[in-house]
Amino acid sequence: MGNSVTHTGAIAASGGTIRLLGDRVSLLDQASLDVSSPNGGGTVLVGGDYQGRATVPVAQVTTVGPDTTIRADALSSGNGGEIIVWAAETANIHGILTARGGAIAGNGGLIETSGRQTLNLTATVEAGAPGGVGNVGGLWLIDPETFLLLPLAVALLAAVMLT
């Protein structure tokens, strides 16, 4: 492919789809991608599609900076959307990613953070279902070839799982 995409601004597509694809994809500074809508979240693809499927071009390196936000929330009723951040080699994923179900009703969405060879992950991720009884939380798929948890991350993960 040989092309690079760097985004530092804001893109909004209420309930729609945003695709940032290329050989190297970077979301930097205070970049914002938002496909949230009142009745359900849309889809954001950064660097590839679900589990690296060849339906779209796949990035070798994907970076989501620490001040970046990616949102695919249902704002009122409806299900959270889908956020895929993917790289065939290295994914550096920081910032905030949300695919929440609606405040009144709706299930959480899907968030995938994957680097086939290397995944550097410090992102805040939320795919919950805050509204109504019987709503189901979403899915966070973490899919590197090798997964390393540092001691602080293990302690934080344990604390979250106990609450």
Question: Predicted regions: what is each one?
Answer:
Residues M1-T163:
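Extracellular and secretory-pathway beta-repeat/beta-biased strand scaffolds
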